[in-house]
Design a protein with these regions (language model features):
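N-terminal basic/disordered segments at the start of proteins
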Residues: 21-42, 47
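Glycine-rich phosphate/pyrophosphate-binding loops
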Residues: 45-62, 131-136
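A generic, well-ordered mixed alpha/beta core segment in the N-terminal half of proteins
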Residues: 68-169, 184
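Flexible, glycine/charged-enriched surface loops at secondary-structure junctions
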Residues: 81-85, 131-132, 163-173, 232-249, ...
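Phosphate/diphosphate-binding glycine-rich loops and adjacent basic-rich segments that engage nucleotide
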Residues: 95, 99-101, 107-111, 127, ...
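C-terminal functional modules
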Residues: 317-357
Length: 357
């Protein structure tokens, strides 16, 4: 079997500066995910970092608005000092302070993802001794980020098994490219994290499809649902069309919730100009069927998002159909901040990923 290993510690350099250990991170190979993970880890460990060449290999390198919102959110909740926190910056220095619970409001000012900002601040806030409430404004259904529905139905229930209690409520959807969605979140103190295992998803219980529309013809959602219904032989009772509260701009998202005995996955498709409703549904169906055709418990998008909470808990394991680049880079970065090892090995049930202190 092929194996992979993100050793503890991974490659990094430390420099003593103003009595604080600073980790040097090469940001050229990763995207915003690398930055968000570094911000979370820095606040959780009290270790500062300097990230250089941020998103250097992207068509628009440097910090974009949603990345800057994540930096500013982390700075605010953690009373941190930053150098280079501005649009387009390719180098950032982040020196964490004391994380304080409370009520916070953050806005990306565009369709930049509100859910990615939420995932940045969740870990340090659940380590506080009092609850926090958040109001996040921006994109809630963005093709390059977890949807608000994925957060509510897949990500947070997975965290619950690790011992983390958080919830979200969607006040107003924010579709790409206009954004302007509003998402509320509450985070409770996590008094004891558990070593959770996501190895067997159990028996299939249900599949349901939801078409979300704002400012668009209902016929678009009807065609999407008809296509998904045919691909998965779904009854009419499993197909739901929702015209949601008007957002800042028109939009369409297509959701497929696949519930098994031990785990629920949420797949999200996004309507876009020039792509037919049928093609939106077919692409979503292909993604879901690829996961259903495996014996792995966790689908690709959730897999790299489980590493950080499992590392903070000191251990955990899951199976997933593939090892993504995001998972590899997340594993390497976590090893720079925390005394954990992350190993993956190919098995008949897919890749088994193990986090151990």
């Amino acid at each position: 079997n092929r194996t992979g290993w993100a050793a503890m510690p991974a490659r990094f350099s430390r420099q003593k500066t103003n009595a604080m250990d600073m980790i040097e991170i090469d940001g050229s190979a990763g995207g915003g995910q690398l930055l968000r993970t570094a911000l979370s880890l820095s606040l959780c460990t009290g270790t500062g970092f300097t990230m250089r060449s941020i998103r250097a290999k992207r068509s628009r390198p440097g910090l974009m608005r949603q990345h800057l919102t994540a930096v500013n959110a982390a700075t605010r909740i953690g009373n941190a000092c930053t150098h280079g926190a501005e649009l387009g910056a390719t180098d950032l220095r982040f020196e964490p302070g004391v994380v304080l619970p409370g009520e916070y409001a953050f806005a990306t000012g565009s369709a930049g993802s509100a859910t990615l900002v939420l995932q940045t601040v969740l870990p340090p806030l659940w380590r506080c001794d009092a609850p926090s409430r958040l109001r996040l404004e921006g994109g809630t259904h963005n093709p390059l980020a977890p949807s608000a529905d994925f957060i509510a139905d897949t990500y947070l229930p997975a965290l619950k098994r690790i011992g983390i209690d958080a919830s979200v409520e969607l006040e107003r959807p924010g579709f790409f490219p206009a954004g302007g969605g509003i998402l509320h979140a509450t985070v409770a103190p996590a008094t004891a994290l558990r070593h959770a295992e996501f190895l067997d998803r159990g028996a299939l219980q249900s599949i349901e499809a939801v078409a979300l529309l704002s400012g668009l013809s209902s016929s678009i959602g009807e065609r999407e649902l008809q296509t998904l219904g045919a691909r998965f032989a779904l009854p009419e009772t499993a197909l739901h069309l929702r015209q949601v509260r008007p957002s800042i701009g028109p939009g369409n998202a297509l959701l497929l919730r696949v519930r098994h005995e031990h785990h629920t996955e949420t797949f999200t498709g996004h309507g876009e100009r020039g792509t037919s409703a049928e093609n939106v549904a077919m692409r979503l169906a292909d993604e879901a069927r690829a996961w259903l055709g495996s014996d792995a418990c966790v689908a690709e998008h959730l897999s790299d998002q489980l590493l950080l909470p499992m590392a903070l808990a000191g251990g955990g394991a899951f199976t997933t159909p593939a090892i993504s680049d995001h998972l590899r880079s997340n594993a390497r970065l976590i090893g720079q901040f925390l005394p954990v090892g992350i190993e993956w090995i190919e098995t008949p049930c897919g890749w088994r990923v193990t986090v151990a202190s």
